[in-house]
Amino acid sequence: MLETLLQLRARTYDVAIVDLSLPDARGLDAVSHMRRAAPDTAIIVHSGHEDDGMALHALQLGAQDVLAKSRVTPPLLNRTIRFAVERKRTQQRLANLAHFDQLTGLANRTTLHDRVEHATSMARRRGDELALLYVDLDGFKKVNDTHGHEAGDALLRQVANRLRDVVRGCDTVARLGGDEFAILLEDTNGRPDIPAQRVVDTLGESFTLGDVTVSVSGSVGVAIYPAAGDTVEDLLRSADEAMYEAKVSGKGRMAIAAPVTRSSSTTRVRTLVPQSPVAPSPPVAMSTR
């Protein structure tokens, strides 16, 4: 079984057939091990017994089909393999729809929520900080209205690519909807303003959409865990409010949410202008929306 698992990890297979009668198959535990080793591979269980309970359990563990040896014929085996592969692909498409934005390929709001929740849990145990960036495009509506929705969609895809390029592979870039994005930054070394400024800078460069060149900018709000909130909702709210302050103070800027005072109805932010990303301007008081 170990050799099989190593092969599954080393190469990509469309389908794997596990024979439960083999000495090293270890029963249905083999399905669980294979599922973890090759999550993209369809699994067919080959059994010497027609047992509905066993078959149901195998499907619950991640198999795509169960085939009794007494009923195997070449046409049936061929059909079972084709159907198992197609079922696996359908499952993958549905999972993709549930967790990723279909226009940009970025994580969606649900996936972002899950990852921020996990990251804050880990940071709480380790005593670390992390940052959540809320990004809103300035001027997107004008592009959409002037050049059409296809151009707007193309712009959003290019924005997504640029956001991915300016952060690390371990960071999460998500599209929240419309022209709003979020970025989860883990292990920021106390300087989330540096990657946030890179976001402002890259969005300030012009975009080429076919024969048209357009210019937009990005307003970025930064919420630092745990100072600006200790739940996903609190961090999103703080980052959103900081983004709003950056937008009303001139657009194409970033603002960092100051520590939340639980007994206060206001959130304080300090605004950092693009020309001086490491020199904060005086704090600005902002009422919670």
Predicted segments with their positions:
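Receiver (REC) domain switch/output surface
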Residues: 76-88, 115, 119, 242
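Amphipathic HAMP/coiled-coil signal-transducing linker helices
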Residues: 90-107, 121
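Alpha4 helix (beta4-alpha4-beta5 surface) of REC/receiver domains from two-component response regulators
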Residues: 28-29, 49-67, 71
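Conserved long alpha-helical elements within nucleotide-processing catalytic cores of c-di-GMP signaling
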Residues: 108-131, 138-168, 174-178, 182-186, ...
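Acidic, metal-coordinating helix/loop segments flanking the phosphotransfer/catalytic sites
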Residues: 1-15
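Cyclic nucleotide signaling catalytic output domains
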Residues: 68, 173, 198, 208, ...
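Short amphipathic alpha-helix used as the core "switch/output" element in two-component signaling
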Residues: 6, 28-40, 57
